Amino acid sequence: MLAAVIHELGHFLVLCCFGIRVRSLRVCVLGAVMEADTARLSYPRELVATLAGPGANLLFCALLSIWDESRFTPLVGASVVLCVFNLLPILPLDGGRALYLLTAWCFGGQVGERVARVTGACCAVALGGGLFYVMACTGGSLWLAPVALAAFAAAARLLLNYEIFL
């Protein structure tokens, strides 16, 4: 939970530095989604705000690794997992948003959206399939089922062109 708070705090602090108001914070199966008035931001600034969450997790890990304490291992592990998961190129995760922003900045909004949707759908199907494979191989791990189903739902939304925080 602390890793998630630090992650969202990273987004929040950068948005505040850019003078952007945060409208809401919603928690869902894939994590939390912060809604802000980012329409005023340029692609590079929004990219910085998007990557600030994973960056905060990495900074937190670096700070904790200064002390050689085994009691911090779970916190470091949770922060690394959250960072890596959020960098997957699946909308609405930070990685999917970053992919959209980079391609939109270089090639325009339509190309950015198309690239982010197709890449995100492929990655979401691979993630969901991989998680179901792990569940089948281990004969359990049912705690992975909600994440796998959410990944398949994200792929369906991306392929069917439903609105996903763009």
Residue ranges and their predicted role:
Residues 1-166:
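Hydrophobic transmembrane alpha-helices and their immediate loop junctions
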